[in-house]
Every structure is written in structure tokens, then in C-alpha cells.
């Protein structure tokens, strides 16, 4: 479709957003308002109608999925095979800048980007080196806390020496010492973490005017998608490139700012005009996704936030069904209700893949997983272990990194996979490498055999495998061929076969397929690197999206945050309980509470056709260490905009044959036969003692610690006195 045809399809606000190119433009894009169409049409318009060279346009977003989708749409519109990828994530663009100009701040171009597992290993090693003593309790959470603190320091541009100098407590000083050791390890291994990518570019631009001007002059137009998610550092990079020009468009929705815990600042999009005083603001307020009923309840709810920019979203979509709010008497009955309702929906013509089950925290999915499995409803858990984070894939990637980038972290991992080499030998290799100022790969493949003869005398064949693989890399051999050679000749693949690790072998085969596609599609003009393997490793390091829902017929279970940017025909938002959604942390902070409210708004606006909200009343929660109460957000929903279903027997759930057949079926006849202290037995949970009675609910402490304390209805047919 031509650009002219696309412009004809836009509404007035969308058209204004595309055609305004002489002033900075802030587009406030309501949920489902077609922002991706607007931003891609604007890029195509700049290329086709303003004759701007595609490589002189920079468009940045926050996920590889979004960048890929935008790139594909622009290519479809323009039929343009441009020279280099100009649509990318912030991190990918920063990586490109550093590959080209990082040498001006002492960075080698073939640096390694480490992942979260590497970070944890470095922290563990730094902790050992520091001799800092931790209690058993602190050890459990130390990794998470220190990495969060390091991220915070980096975003505030605080280096390790400043962190040590400004430490005000023993804990903070310990964190700062670990930070210094962590950063030293990165420098020694020519490695960067994700935060470093942006920090190094910031420092490069700050310190070197010539390089800054080079990159400023590289672009005639800059566009930023999901602008509400930007942090101060990212906004600084945008300002570096655009502060002296009018050629900037930012797109975002303040009502969907749900990543403040990652550093996103709501004020940046709200106060855009303070930085760009001549900017114009355009609101996209027509929703193309949801029914009027879903949109009305979403609009009504988000108005409870005080710190926001008012906008009234409307739709011309056909009217749909009323939103349903369902009260359940336990987490089990909530899961049973949802699964029974899913079966009804499928009978009505929906597919399983048309349905999302959303929750605020991952722990809430457990009951749904059990119940869906029991009812033989196919489902997938989104945001579980990603393909690239599976151990076998990380092992394979370590082989590739060792023979190309030669980083010590990957070399240590590979050596640890070889049966003939133990931890003591690896330590000797590391120490010898440090003494001789060599990396591990160069040491073990060194022609001077005296360096390591006593340590690696049984590894001559393996060392030859590494040397041959390194030469294959230098010859730019297909990556699939290099990896197959490494995994077969090293004995790694055979080890998986002997152990009958079928899943791992299937994952390796999937990786071979991925490498084959990359080899076939590789074109150096799309990369800042001519070597296939290096280009692949660079691209893979920057791929960090949450697992996407596979295009197969399964119900998807995912957190509200993972659902951002997605949509589906039917959405269940579950666990609307105080302390769960909103989370406990929001109880002492207005800003946190407003962010939780925005998170629910995001969840509400994922639904296209039907929306169900569920909560539990009276059940005991181990998460909360108390009875579950309805979320305060339920009281903020307009009662005229939803249909309420109680936990009692006149609900749809009671009429479900599936539910009547379950061991949790509650008979209509009431039984008030229990007293505190009674010994009882449940057909599924075993024996226990009644510790509290609330109306017709029993709080039972079960002997089996796996179940602990649970709320069970007095008339539950699976329960009896003993």
C-alpha cells in the first residue's frame, strides 16, 4: 500500500501527527489508538514524501519485538531496501555507537554484552574475593539487592569510587566494594552490562564534542516510541541528538507508565514542553481495539489518578457484552471459575489462543496451572525460562563466544563442562593466564606448551578442536557448521545423548535451525560487522524480550507487565485483592498506588471483546499471611459498568458440570457442625485442625506443611470430622 493510501486511512489526529515535521511533536497515544500505524506511516512519509535517506532516520523503542514490527511495516510500505537498520531498541543503537566509536573512551570494538546469569556469577566471585561475611538470610537475597543497587548507581552515573566515598552505612559500603570488584571484572574481560551500553554512550558524547556532532549530523529525524518508559539517562541521549533541532517525534501514553521500578520517569513525558518549548502536542483518543463497555470502565477507573494528563478515549466499535466482576470464596474456586468459563467460551466459538489470564504477580498462576491441566485445557506460561536462558543454550553460546570473542567468562563456563577438568584445574588456568597477561583461550591454545603442560597434558585433542573452530570463525564459516563441529568434537552433544537429555537435544537442534536461518539471511550491510559469528553474537546479546505467546491454540498465562503492548479477544484479570493488586508496597506511597492503578488500566485495555475480573474473599493467603480481602480498586470501578457475580450458589460456576464433579464441589445444604479445635480430614489435603471460623468458612491448619493454613467452606463435601 502506498503512503498516499495510508494517509487517507488516518483519522484527523493521526494525520496531524504524521504531517507535522517542522516542530518537536509529542503524541499522547491512548490504548489501542493505532500508534504503531502512526509512527510507521510517519517514517514512510519522511522517506517517500520528504526524500530523507532512510539511514538518516533514527527510530528507537524498548523491545526487539516492537522494533522488528515497525521495521517490517515500513519495508512493506516503502519497498525500500535500506542500508542499515535505523529502527532499533535504545540498547541496540547504543551498541552500534560503541562498536564504531567506543575506542575514543578506551573500549575495544569486540566487547561482550553480559546477561543476568553472568552478572550473578561475577557478583558471587566478587563476594568471595571481598571476604565480606553474610548471614544465611542475607545470602538468599544478596544477588538481587546488590544488582538493583548497582543499576541504581549506574543510572545516576555514580562510579564505584564515588559509591565507596559516599557510603553512609556498613551495608552500603559493602555494596560499593562489590560494585568496584564487579566493574573491574567487566573491564578486565572487555565486557559491558545492559546499563553500561547507555552510560558509555552518554560519557562518550559528554566528553567528546567531535563524536557528538558526528552522531548529531548522522540523523535528519529522530522518533521515540513508548516514550513514557524513558528514564533520565535515555532522555539525556535523546537531548544530545535533538536539542538543537525541531526534528523529533515522541509517542507514548502517561497512563501506561508502569516501569518506574526500572527507572522510567512519568515527569519526562508530562513535562516534555518544558524541554522543547516550541513542541506541539497531539492526542490520539480514538480506540480501535475494545468494545465501548470495556473502554468505558477503563476510562472511568483511570480517572482516580490525580497525576495524569486528562484525555477521554472513545470508540466507534460495536457495542459488546458487559464486563463481569466475579467474587470467589478461594483461590481454587477462582481458578475453577475461570477454567469453566473458558470451556464455555470455546463452545461459543472462541479459540484457546484468544484468551489471556492476567495476574499481578507470578506466584498467582499456580492454581490456574493446576486447574487448567485438570480440565485438559491447553495453556502456555508466558515469561518462564526463555529459550536463550536455558542452560544448554547458554552452554552452546559460551563455546561460540570462547573461540571468537575469547572472553574469560565464556571460557570458564566451557572448561567447567569438560569432565577431565575440575575446579582446581580451572583455578590454576585462571591464575596462570593472569600471571602471563593472557586471556584463557590464548593461554590454552598457546604454542608455548610449557605454560600449561602440567595442567592440560590430557587435553591436547580438545585444544586442537578449539584451535580448528577458531580458524573456522576467522574464515567466516557458517555459524551452524562451527557450532556443530564444537559440540560434536568436544563430546558435549554425545554427553547429552548418553544422559538421554531429549529436551536439551531438541533445544540444540532448534538453535541449529536458528543459526541456519541467520547464515542464509546474513547480509553485512545490515550490520556494523562483516563476520557472521560476531554479528550473530551482537544481535543475540541485545535480544531480551519477555517470551512472546506462541501462535498456537493455547490459553496464555502472564503477568500484567508482560501483557503490556499485547491484546486479545478475551481477558481474565485475576487476584484483584488488597496487597496483591495493588501490591503491599503501594500502601504507603501515593506514587506507587497510582502506578498500580496504571498497571490495572493497562490490563483492562488489553481486552478486545470480553473482560472478566475476579477476586477472592475470605480465603487465607500465605503471601499476605492473612485472609484475602477485595482490592480497593474494585470500589473504584463504576458499578453501572459491570455485572456482579457473587461466590454463592446462584452463579454460573454452580451450574457448571465440571465444577460439580470436582472434589471441591460445595453441596447446597448448609452444615454448621464445626467448632474451633475440631480435628478434620479433607479428601485431597489430608488431616488438620480447625483454628478459626468465619461465617461459614473454616480456617484449617493442615498437618501436611505443603498446604499449611487454608480456608474451606463448612459445607464442602470433601471435608469431614475425624
From Swiss-Prot:
Its EC number is 5.6.2.4. Residues 292-565 form the UvrD-like helicase C-terminal domain. GO terms for molecular function: 3'-5' DNA helicase activity; ATP binding; ATP hydrolysis activity; DNA binding. It catalyses: Couples ATP hydrolysis with the unwinding of duplex DNA by translocating in the 3'-5' direction; ATP + H2O = ADP + phosphate + H(+). The keyword DNA damage applies. GO terms for biological process: DNA replication; recombinational repair. Residues 8-291 form the UvrD-like helicase ATP-binding domain. GO terms for cellular component: cytosol; DNA helicase complex. Pfam families: UvrD-helicase (PF00580), UvrD_C (PF13361). The keyword Nucleotide-binding applies. ATP binds at residues 32-37, 289. Keywords: ATP-binding, DNA damage, DNA repair, DNA replication, DNA-binding, Helicase, Hydrolase, Isomerase, Nucleotide-binding. Gene3D superfamilies: 1.10.10.160, P-loop containing nucleotide triphosphate hydrolases, PCRA, domain 4. CDD domains: DEXQc_UvrD, SF1_C_UvrD. Belongs to the helicase family. UvrD subfamily. Has both ATPase and helicase activities. Unwinds DNA duplexes with 3' to 5' polarity with respect to the bound strand and initiates unwinding most effectively when a single-stranded region is present. Involved in the post-incision events of nucleotide excision repair and methyl-directed mismatch repair. This is Probable DNA helicase II homolog. It comes from Mycoplasma capricolum subsp. capricolum (strain California kid / ATCC 27343 / NCTC 10154).
Amino acid at each position: 500500500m502506498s503512503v498516499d493510501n495510508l494517509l487517507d486511512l488516518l483519522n484527523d489526529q493521526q494525520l496531524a501527527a504524521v504531517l507535522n515535521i517542522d516542530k518537536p511533536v509529542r503524541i499522547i497515544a491512548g490504548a489501542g489508538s493505532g500508534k504503531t500505524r502512526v509512527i510507521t506511516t510517519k517514517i514512510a512519509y519522511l522517506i517517500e514524501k520528504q526524500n530523507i535517506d532512510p539511514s538518516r532516520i533514527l527510530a528507537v523503542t524498548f523491545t526487539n519485538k516492537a522494533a522488528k514490527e515497525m521495521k517490517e511495516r515500513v519495508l512493506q510500505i516503502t519497498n525500500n531496501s535500506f542500508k542499515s537498520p535505523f529502527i532499533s531498541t535504545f540498547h541496540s543503537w547504543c551498541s552500534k555507537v560503541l562498536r564504531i566509536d567506543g575506542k575514543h573512551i578506551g573500549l575495544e570494538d569486540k566487547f561482550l554484552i553480559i546477561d543476568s546469569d553472568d552478572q550473578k556469577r561475577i557478583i558471587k566471585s566478587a563476594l568471595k574475593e571481598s571476604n565480606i561475611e553474610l548471614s544465611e538470610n542475607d545470602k538468599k537475597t544478596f544477588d538481587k539487592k546488590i544488582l538493583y543497587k548497582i543499576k541504581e548507581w549506574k543510572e545516576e552515573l555514580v562510579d564505584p569510587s564515588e559509591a565507596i566515598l559516599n557510603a553512609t552505612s556498613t551495608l552500603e559500603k559493602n555494596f560499593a566494594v562489590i560494585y568496584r570488584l564487579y566493574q573491574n571484572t567487566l573491564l578486565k574481560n572487555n565486557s559491558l552490562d545492559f546499563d553500561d551500553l547507555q552510560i558509555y554512550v552518554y560519557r562518550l558524547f559528554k566528553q567528546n564534542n567531535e563524536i557528538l556532532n558526528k552522531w548529531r549530523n548522522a540523523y535528519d529525524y529522530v522518533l521515540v516510541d513508548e516514550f513514557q518508559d524513558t528514564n533520565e539517562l535515555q532522555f539525556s541521549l535523546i537531548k544530545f541528538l535533538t536539542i538543537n533541532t525541531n526534528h523529533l517525534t515522541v509517542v507514548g501514553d502517561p497512563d501506561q507508565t508502569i516501569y518506574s521500578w526500572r527507572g522510567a520517569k512519568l515527569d519526562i513525558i508530562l513535562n516534555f514542553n518544558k524541554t522543547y518549548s516550541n513542541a506541539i502536542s497531539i492526542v490520539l483518543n480514538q480506540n480501535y481495539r475494545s468494545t465501548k463497555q470495556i473502554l468505558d470502565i477503563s476510562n472511568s477507573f483511570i480517572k482516580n489518578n490525580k497525576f495524569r494528563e486528562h484525555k477521554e478515549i472513545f470508540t466507534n466499535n460495536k457495542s459488546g457484552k458487559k464486563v463481569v466482576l466475579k467474587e470467589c470464596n478461594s483461590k481454587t474456586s477462582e481458578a475453577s471459575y475461570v477454567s469453566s468459563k473458558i470451556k464455555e467460551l470455546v463452545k461459543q466459538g472462541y479459540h484457546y489462543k484468544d484468551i489471556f489470564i492476567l495476574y499481578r504477580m507470578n506466584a498467582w498462576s499456580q492454581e490456574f496451572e493446576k486447574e487448567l491441566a485438570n480440565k485438559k485445557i491447553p495453556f502456555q506460561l508466558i515469561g518462564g525460562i526463555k529459550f536463550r536462558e536455558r542452560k544448554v543454550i547458554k552452554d552452546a553460546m559460551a563455546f561460540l563466544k570462547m573461540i571468537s570473542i575469547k572472553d574469560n567468562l565464556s571460557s570458564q563456563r566451557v572448561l567447567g563442562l569438560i569432565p577431565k577438568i575440575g575446579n582446581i584445574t580451572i583455578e590454576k588456568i585462571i591464575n596462570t593466564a593472569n600471571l602471563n597477561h593472557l586471556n584463557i583461550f590464548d593461554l590454552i591454545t598457546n604454542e608455548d606448551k610449557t605454560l600449561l603442560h602440567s595442567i592440560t597434558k590430557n587435553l591436547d585433542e580438545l585444544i586442537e578442536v578449539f584451535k580448528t573452530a577458531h580458524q573456522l570463525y576467522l574464515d567466516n564459516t557458517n555459524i551452524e557448521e562451527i557450532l556443530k563441529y564444537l559440540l560434536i568434537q568436544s563430546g558435549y552433544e554425545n554427553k547429552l545423548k548418553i544422559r538421554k537429555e531429549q529436551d536439551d537435544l531438541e533445544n540444540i537442534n532448534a538453535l541449529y535451525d536458528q543459526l541456519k536461518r541467520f547464515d542464509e539471511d546474513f547480509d553485512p550491510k545490515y550490520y556494523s560487522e562483516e563476520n557472521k559469528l560476531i554479528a550473530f553474537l551482537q544481535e543475540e546479546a541485545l535480544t531480551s524480550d519477555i517470551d512472546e505467546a506462541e501462535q498456537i491454540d493455547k490459553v496464555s498465562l502472564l503477568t500484567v507487565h508482560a501483557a503490556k503492548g499485547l491484546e486479545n479477544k478475551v481477558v481474565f484479570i485475576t487476584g484483584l485483592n488488597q496487597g496483591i493488586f495493588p501490591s503491599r508496597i503501594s500502601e504507603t506511597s501515593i506514587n506507587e498506588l497510582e502506578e498500580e492503578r496504571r498497571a490495572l488500566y493497562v490490563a483492562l485495555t488489553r481486552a478486545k471483546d470480553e473482560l472478566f475480573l475476579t477476586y477472592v474473599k475470605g480465603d487465607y493467603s500465605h503471601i499476605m499471611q492473612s485472609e484475602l480481602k477485595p482490592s480497593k480498586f474494585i470500589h473504584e470501578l463504576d458499578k453501572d459498568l459491570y455485572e456482579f457475580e457473587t461466590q454463592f450458589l446462584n452463579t454460573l460456576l454452580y451450574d457448571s458440570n465440571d465444577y460439580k464433579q470436582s472434589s471441591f464441589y460445595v453441596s447446597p445444604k448448609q452444615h454448621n457442625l464445626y467448632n474451633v479445635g475440631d480435628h478434620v480430614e479433607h479428601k485431597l489435603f489430608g488431616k488438620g485442625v480447625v483454628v478459626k471460623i468465619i461465617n461459614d468458612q473454616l480456617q484449617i491448619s493442615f498437618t501436611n506443611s505443603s498446604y499449611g493454613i487454608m480456608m474451606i467452606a463448612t459445607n464442602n463435601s470433601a471435608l469431614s470430622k475425624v
